[in-house]
Amino acid sequence: MNSLEQAEDLKAFERRLTEYVSCLQPATGRWRMILIVVSVCTATGAWNWLIDPETQKVSFFTSLWNHPFFTISCITLIGLFFAGIHKRVVAPSIIAARCRTVLAEYNMSCDDTGKLILKPRPHVQ
């Protein structure tokens, strides 16, 4: 393979990688917003649950029954983590990290947007 073909292959790979990472960004943003909203709801519900004087007087399950906002938001947050939201909010970073691992063997790397970074060849003495 000559240098021109190699350069074209690298450009095509870079275009495809940046396209893939950029396609993940809107979904990642939505998952981050969902996680933020549910986390704030859970924190607000937890605060109301903790400052309620009845919480100390009744059983744990009765206390949860008396605070449905906290209970539902907490169950939703746990469900989101079981569904893998913690992976979805960092999906572009995971893809970039895996690409960096593979590209390191070829003295290359990439940034978080998928742009290739060519490293200088090591000089063998």
Curated annotation (Swiss-Prot):
BP GO annotations: lipid metabolic process; positive regulation of triglyceride biosynthetic process
Gene Ontology CC: cytoplasm; Nem1-Spo7 phosphatase complex; nuclear membrane
The species this protein was found in: Xenopus tropicalis
Protein's name in the database: Nuclear envelope phosphatase-regulatory subunit 1
Superkingdom classification of source: Eukaryota
Membrane topology category: Multi-pass membrane protein
Subcellular localization, as worded in the UniProt entry: Nucleus membrane; Cytoplasm
MF terms (GO), sorted A to Z: protein phosphatase regulator activity
Entry similarity comment: Belongs to the CNEP1R1 family.
Keyword line: Cytoplasm, Lipid metabolism, Membrane, Nucleus, Transmembrane, Transmembrane helix
Name of the gene this protein is made from: cnep1r1
